[in-house]
């Protein structure tokens, strides 16, 4: 990850730009739903809506946690489950300790580049009711 304001790295072209970010904390007993709120805040900061989003990467600390988030988004009519973890999530491809953020952001940036879609959301549940979310904008030159 490179902060472009600090100068470009010769020979490296950025894949994506962080367009918005959000955090949220629930009571610990409601931990699984925090990514839903964090993602909504990130979208608001990016000044886009779920209708603009083509890809979602959601960490799977536990299967039920991911299902709870997708179910909450479905109940609101916000997200097509087909765009969530389209290449498999942590249960399928691994969940290295301390690497969830890098894994979901990297996977999302590459999904956007491969598809040519412009917007994606990465969200992670980080424990004890907390969550982080980031909106990425594809700037790789293949954005639609």
How would you name each of these model-derived features?
Residues 1-144:
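Claisen-condensing/thiolase-fold acyl-transfer catalytic domains that form or cleave C-C bonds
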């Amino acid at each position: 990850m490179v902060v472009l304001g600090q100068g470009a790295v010769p020979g490296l072209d950025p894949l994506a730009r962080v367009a918005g970010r959000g955090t949220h904390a629930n009571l610990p007993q409601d931990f699984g739903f925090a990514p839903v709120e964090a993602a909504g805040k990130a979208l608001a900061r990016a000044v886009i809506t779920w209708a603009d989003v083509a890809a979602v990467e959601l960490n799977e600390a536990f299967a039920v946690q991911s299902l709870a988030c997708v179910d909450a988004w479905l109940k609101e009519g916000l997200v097509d489950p087909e765009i969530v973890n389209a290449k498999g999530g942590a249960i399928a491809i691994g969940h290295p300790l301390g690497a969830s953020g890098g894994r979901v952001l990297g996977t999302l940036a590459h999904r956007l580049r491969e598809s040519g879609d412009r917007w994606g959301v990465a969200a992670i549940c980080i424990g004890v009711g907390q969550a982080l979310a980031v909106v990425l904008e594809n700037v790789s030159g293949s954005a639609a």
